[in-house]
């Protein structure tokens, strides 16, 4: 029988609402961890979600305004939207540990880090430049869940919440690294989400 989805996937993909890649990626992890889900729009709001005015009608209530440097979406880099504080506020039993791309000395170190985390069934979300993944010129940040890494094949598989991209995306590791380094605000990083008791 043909594989309809990857046999070794660790996640059930979800599809994002406009500009909600971060909260949707978090919900993908929450579902895997057996945690109660909350609407991506609500989680996004608390993480500083801001939209272009023309998309306001897609939401019950949302901030609109000037386009931030990384594009429309969440604003976790601002103190009032810091992810661990928001998780506490919303009683989400997860803790985020960020790993900026500069944390890794080279490709080998990054690959070993991801490989080890996946081997131990840890949850990783990557913040990167969508332009590198999608061959566009929109200057937007994007978030995906890291599903698997295959060092021998030089591939990494992401769960992409975008409505217009494949849910399971395999890309070359060098392209993955370039996408992280090319994040529009230099905030490209890997977030490890750990369940807290």
Q: Can you annotate each of these PLM segments?
A:
Residues 18, 95, 119, 137-140, ...:
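Noncatalytic regulatory segments and standalone regulatory/sensor domains
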Residues 46, 50, 86, 117, ...:
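Residues that form generic nucleotide/phosphate-binding pockets
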Residues 39, 100, 129, 170-172:
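Short, solvent-exposed coil/turn linker segments
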Residues 28, 130-133, 163-165:
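Solvent-exposed loop/turn segments at secondary-structure junctions
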Residues 66-143, 147-149, 194:
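Predominantly the structural core of cysteine protease catalytic domains
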